[in-house]
Amino acid sequence: MNKIISFICLLSIYVLNIQSQTIIKTTYNELSSPDGKYLFEVYQKEFTDGTKQLYYTLSYEGKSVIEESELGVLIENQLFESALGIPNDSCKVWGANLTLKGNKQNQVNNTWKPLYGERSIVKDYYNELVLNFVKEEQEEGKQIDGYNKNRFYMMSFVIRAYDEGVAFRYHFPEATNGLFLHIVGEQTQFTLPKGTMAYYERWAQGPYELKPLENWSDECERPLTMKLSNGLFVSLAEAEMIDYARMKFRLNETKANTLQASLYSSVDVITPYSTPWRVILVADREIDLIGNNDIILNLNPENKVSNSSWIKPGKVIRATNMKQGEVLKCVDFAAERGLQYIHIDAGWYGPEMKMSSDATSVSENRDLDIPAIINYAEKKGIGLWVYVNQRALVQQLDELLPLYKKWGIKGIKFGFVQIGNQHWSTWLHDAIKKCAEYEIMVDIHDEYRPTGFSRTYPNLLTQEGIRGNEEMPDATHNTILPFTRFLCGAGDYTICYYNNRIKTTHAHQLAMAVVYYSPLQFLYWYDEPSAYKGEPEIEFFDKVKTVWDDTQVINGKIGEYVTIARRSGKDWFLGTIGNTDARTLDTPLSFLDKDKKYLASIYTDDDKIKTKTKVRVTRLIVDSASTFHFQLKASGGCAVHFTPASVAEIKMYRKYKKQPL
């Protein structure tokens, strides 16, 4: 860490030095998105002292998004150079003598079908520009002891421009001299227009604050969503972070309105190697950020699990009472209520924070028989997930996986996973790969945030990295999440229903099952089966899906409200959640098939209903020309299930006629 700080100080001195230099040459390249809305300009300035610096700008529909910002990787390789008998690099900053040798442009336009997702078909359409640089020049006659003793490096800067956003990264081709790379940071900057406001979040399970780009107490999590003074909305994210160090954003100490890519730790790599993607999404309307989140998956390699038939998303209830009889009641409840899994959480094999706890067997003080539970559950079509803390996973993973497969366990929830540095990032993704070998699905809890790895290893169904119902946030927080955290992938919010600590209405909780995407969706997080007293609206949880054929964002304003509609087969599900203010909201149903009538089962808050949950169930006939007029309570919401209406249903139920709901 001290080495990283010293390099940051050195970089600040270097920047101040080049600012006092005269530019003698500028080399420009540019790349546009297929629809022409994004324009990415990248250029290298050469100064009078011989140093060079790479910069970029980004505009969207002619409006400035990223003003002149530095690019580059900070590498400290003198130790490796000395060990191989290669002369040390004398540059104060590693990229100061990079020379552009050529470029290559490419266009890709295809689609792919995910195993599961928010859409059954994903468009992958982008323009690509690759700039190839060299550092130093090859000299003849230095091929000694089987390797090249030149101080010679190659680096490519790769840019992709999609209609959905722009991404870039640094690629290092295979070295000819055997050198490793010791990366201590990045020069990567994001200079935003003056007046930008950011949804600052200090840690992955933290609250949000809307703040200017100044006086931050610490770094900020990604994705980072911002409002620009020119009316645009921007989100900065990371993709394909597998064996690198996690990036966050910190304020640049010497340049106003500038965010610096900040790595958790240094990184040691062997070439060829590509850093993670730095991703920029831009939209005129904040709801379009949500609709463009496929870019994160597109920036990751395709599915590497050849036989994926065992990977089955679904809904799950946690057994809060870890006694055999109570767990079996959860199995019965899951089977009756259309769930697919039950989950046994922390403590089943002993104190989770003790290295001595053995996850190959049930703790002596627990009345649990795991094989018997699995046998009982399988007869009812229910699978079992179990929690295992990282302390046990680190010691026992290779022993646990064949045992759990033998028992019939379907998935593991990884608990309290250390993340951030290169070591633990690599360990975690390797652990997911190992789970795939034994046909075991994964849910990662606590601070991990996705960067698209579920495309490559879809047994990673979901992850926490979210302030959800374990912390019981308020409704305003909930209306920020779709525009921030959920841009990077599925989130395990752990939805509750009956628990009296929730700070929203019950219809709000119902709607979150649609608004929040999670292929493994926890419902009833703090609840027990006995809490259910026949409330009719629970049928919505029974029927709602966790993966989708289509997703459409109908309306929304960050921190105020959001409405999302999702389709599974012929059925549509709609969820609306509002913040702590009451409001009226018009919701057009134009996403429904034209020339088709639907039976809408509508779930809204109503204090007149004589149940503990106060949710009204209304059934009406609608079509694509209908517009619902919702009256949301403070911290409220509504949920709707649309099914194609039969002739009998059209006769039985009245048509919606614009009445308030």
Question: Where is each model-derived feature located?
Answer:
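Bacterial Sec-dependent N-terminal signal peptides
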Residues: 1-26
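N-terminal accessory beta-strand-rich subdomains and adjacent acidic, glycine-rich linkers
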Residues: 23-299
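Solvent-exposed beta-strand/loop surfaces of large extracellular or lumenal domains
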Residues: 120, 141-145, 200-208, 602-625
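Glycan-recognition and catalytic regions of carbohydrate-active enzymes
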Residues: 131, 528-573, 610-613, 657-658
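An acidic-aromatic substrate-binding cleft motif
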Residues: 270-341, 345
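Aromatic- and carboxylate-enriched substrate-binding clefts and catalytic-loop regions
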Residues: 346-505
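Carbohydrate-binding surface patches
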Residues: 558-596, 638-639
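C-terminal beta-strand-rich structural cap/linker in extracellular carbohydrate-active enzymes
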Residues: 620-657
